[in-house]
Amino acid sequence: MENFFSILGGMGTMATESFVRLINHRTKATKDQEYLNYVLFNHATVPDRTAYILDRSEENPMPFLLDDIEKQNLLRPNFIVLTCNTAHYFFEELQAATDIPILHMPREAANELVRQHTTGRVAILGTEGSMKAGIYEREVKNLGFETVIPDTALQEKINYLIYHEIKESDYLNQELYYEILEEAVERLNCEKVILGCTELSLMHEFAEDNHYPVIDAQSILADRTIERALAERSEALDTASEK
């Protein structure tokens, strides 16, 4: 297979399924051959990223992720998509292990703030691990925006939604999701809310009320993935036609 990308997912699996669904649904295709070529690594058994970030005595996910990168190196995709937000804690080491570009989801989401002409405060919602590591905060601040991180009470609600409701129970609790967004917008006085966790992106995909000013990082990553894949396919076709 030529002109393909690879997806490093499985963290979690349902969120990865959501990402793949976005890729397929948003690709303008009228026949099978117009869809995108990709390989999915659904590595569901990677140790919990947040657990390790919060407590270094927990199992380190890094060796598992590096092994995945090494396997993808052998396949030689055009680029790699990392669909777990918290796994971007290890991004620099992963990118250093390959000459294949890895798309940076938090950076793409931060750039979307510029595209949407954001001027106010930006709330960042995600796992406790990604909050502690500053994965999104760093990218957003680098572009000059004021960031707002959830306080303890709000973070506990986010943790409960991500881990208990979605990951453990496979339950998309819309009422709790709206409550979290309402707090971020009204109580924390934020113009935009970044969904910096793929479980929150999964929640947003199926939410019935989407009037909140959300930047869905996974959705943005899906768009950038499609754009890059189509551009590289077009370039390959142009090169082939010149021969």
Swiss-Prot record:
The entry's keywords: Cell shape, Cell wall biogenesis/degradation, Isomerase, Peptidoglycan synthesis
Alphabetized NCBIfam families for the sequence: asp_race
Residues annotated as the enzyme's active site: 84 (proton donor/acceptor), 197 (proton donor/acceptor)
Enzyme class: isomerase
Binding, substrate: 48-50, 85-87, 167
GO BP annotations listed: cell wall organization; peptidoglycan biosynthetic process; regulation of cell shape
GO molecular function, one term: aspartate racemase activity
Annotated metabolic or biological route of this protein: Cell wall biogenesis; peptidoglycan biosynthesis
Top-level taxon in the UniProt lineage: Bacteria
Keyword Isomerase: yes
The protein's name: Aspartate racemase
Subunit structure of this chain's protein: Homodimer.
Enzyme Commission identifier(s): 5.1.1.13
Function: Aspartate racemase that provides the D-aspartate required by the D-aspartate ligase to be added onto the lysine residue in the peptidoglycan precursor UDP-MurNAc-pentapeptide.
Catalytic reaction annotation: L-aspartate = D-aspartate
Source species of the chain: Enterococcus faecium (strain Aus0004)
Residue intervals passing through the bilayer: none
Entry similarity comment: Belongs to the aspartate/glutamate racemases family.
